[in-house]
């Protein structure tokens, strides 16, 4: 029986190529590689300390909620590790200066501003098959307009064209990603379902295919504004992991996005350090190693911004504590 199975496997491999079929235990590269999102809070909520390589990720939410900011931070992290990233700007709205402020090396970022949805997704497929690109960001699904719609008149209604386009493209792209270990992040918007009286009236453009093929789906929402004096300097946002094939879903992350600077990593470190009792609070005063270091959270953030050695020391302790198995009982 064992010999028969071995012969069958050899026959299939001979016909369809090496590794077309195998025993699960013989597959050495099944362990998913991870890269940081650039946010300590999001890394922790994902349960795997970052985004997986070779998978599709959807980041969706209302306008100005921080979707593109999260994607740009992911690009910066890939580039820091020596990887190559591409940005498919279907909305034709990328801000090079903002990307640079977030740590993106714009000189090494591949940019495409396609004319149609077909062109955009074909470029994604070619880049993925090349095995030379580590991360591709598509901004956004809603802007992937099918050629049949572009070539038609304003009065024409083309039902389901974008959904069919996405379904066909994702079937091709998914197979390429597994071999190349390229990650694709699709940024998506939110639409209201017409005539919905019960249940969630919100939906995302592009049909059901993207929901199905995505290994991770993040719902990004603005919670409140952040003010410095009388000036609004940023937003507090909530990220909910609504789908996660690699860890437990439905976890939430909260972070602060500072205008022109992106995710405040110092704010994240302070919140985690306080929750983990690395930094303790007595009234308005903050203590570290039983020493009074700052009065008020804003002063603590200013201190860590100026004192890189102290910030690095606290951050190292936070990351170490988060890696422990009992961290969920602490937070």
Curated annotation (Swiss-Prot):
The UniProt keywords, alphabetically, are: ATP-binding, Cytoplasm, DNA damage, DNA recombination, DNA repair, DNA-binding, Nucleotide-binding, SOS response
GO BP, one example? DNA repair
Location relative to the cell:
Cytoplasm
Membrane-crossing ranges are none
The GO terms this record gives for MF are:
ATP binding; ATP hydrolysis activity; ATP-dependent DNA damage sensor activity; damaged DNA binding; single-stranded DNA binding
- Superkingdom in the source lineage: Bacteria
Give the residues annotated as coiled coil: none
- GO CC terms, sorted: cytosol
List, alphabetically, the InterPro entries matched: AAA+_ATPase (IPR003593), DNA_recomb/repair_RecA (IPR013765), DNA_recomb/repair_RecA_CS (IPR020584), P-loop_NTPase (IPR027417), RecA-like_C (IPR049261), RecA-like_N (IPR049428), RecA_ATP-bd (IPR020588), RecA_C_sf (IPR023400)
Asked if Nucleotide-binding is a keyword of the record, the answer is: yes
Residues noted as binding ATP in the record, renumbered to the chain: 61-68
Query: Record's PANTHER family?
Result: MITOCHONDRIAL DNA REPAIR PROTEIN RECA HOMOLOG-RELATED (PTHR45900:SF1), RECA (PTHR45900)
Q: What does this protein do?
A: Can catalyze the hydrolysis of ATP in the presence of single-stranded DNA, the ATP-dependent uptake of single-stranded DNA by duplex DNA, and the ATP-dependent hybridization of homologous single-stranded DNAs. It interacts with LexA causing its activation and leading to its autocatalytic cleavage.
Similarity-based family: Belongs to the RecA family.
Q: What is this protein called?
A: Protein RecA
Q: Which organism is it from?
A: Mycoplasma mobile (strain ATCC 43663 / 163K / NCTC 11711)
Gene that codes for this?
recA
């Amino acid at each position: 029986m064992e010999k028969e199975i071995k012969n069958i496997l050899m026959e299939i491999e001979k016909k369809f190529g090496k590794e077309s079929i195998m025993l699960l235990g013989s597959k050495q590269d099944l362990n998913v590689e991870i890269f940081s999102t650039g946010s300590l809070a999001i890394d922790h909520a994902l349960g795997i300390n970052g985004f997986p390589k070779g998978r599709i990720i959807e980041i969706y939410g209302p306008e100005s909620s921080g979707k593109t900011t999260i994607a740009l931070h992911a690009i910066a992290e890939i580039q820091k590790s020596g990887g190559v990233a591409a940005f498919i700007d279907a909305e034709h709205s990328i801000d090079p200066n903002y990307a640079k402020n977030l740590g993106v090396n714009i000189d090494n970022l591949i940019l495409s501003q396609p004319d149609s949805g077909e062109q955009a997704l074909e470029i994604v497929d070619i880049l993925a098959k090349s095995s030379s690109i580590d991360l591709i960001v598509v901004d956004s699904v809603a802007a992937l307009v099918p050629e049949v719609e572009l070539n038609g008149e304003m009065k024409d209604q083309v039902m389901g064209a974008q959904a069919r386009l996405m379904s066909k493209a994702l079937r091709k792209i998914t197979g390429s990603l597994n071999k190349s270990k390229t990650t694709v992040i699709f940024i998506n918007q939110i639409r209201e379902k017409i005539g919905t009286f019960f249940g969630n009236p919100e939906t995302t453009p592009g049909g059901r295919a993207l929901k199905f093929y995505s290994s991770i789906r993040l719902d990004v929402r603005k919670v409140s504004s952040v003010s410095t004096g009388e000036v609004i300097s940023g937003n507090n946002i909530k990220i909910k992991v609504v789908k996660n094939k690699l860890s437990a879903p439905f976890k939430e992350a909260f972070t602060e996005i500072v205008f022109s600077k992106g995710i405040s990593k110092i704010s994240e470190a302070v919140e985690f350090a306080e929750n983990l009792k690395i930094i303790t609070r007595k009234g308005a005063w903050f203590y570290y190693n039983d020493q009074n270091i700052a009065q008020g959270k804003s002063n603590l953030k200013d201190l860590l911004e100026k004192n890189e050695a102290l910030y690095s020391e606290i951050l190292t302790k936070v990351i170490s504590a988060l890696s422990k198995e009992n961290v969920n009982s602490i937070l």
